[in-house]
A protein has these predicted regions:
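Solvent-exposed interaction patches of small proteins and small membrane subunits
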Residues: 1-87
Length: 87
């Protein structure tokens, strides 16, 4: 992986902390809307981490593919992931 590992790990650790906080909120019977807002915030951070990884894939794996066939394969991989992201 050629992505900025420090940035990715920071984002994922932030999401992890938020999810742990959400679990505590559930145990403490916090208002549902507040819990939902925290879930949305966690999902947004995970999405940012995914975008960073996909960006690195485009900049490194696709660009540096050794053959046209390999480039097409890498592009198909990212296309399939983007379809999932957009859903």
């Amino acid at each position: 992986m050629k992505a900025d590992k420090t940035q990715i790990k920071r984002l994922l650790n932030t999401a992890k902390g938020q999810i742990e906080g959400i679990l505590r909120m559930i145990d403490e019977d916090v208002y549902c809307i507040e819990i939902s807002n925290q879930i949305l915030a966690s999902a947004a951070i995970l999405k940012r981490a995914n975008i960073e990884i996909l960006d690195a894939h485009l900049k490194h794996c696709v660009v540096n593919a050794s053959s046209q066939e390999e480039k097409e394969e890498k592009m198909l991989e990212i296309s399939n992931v983007l379809k999932k992201v957009i859903k």
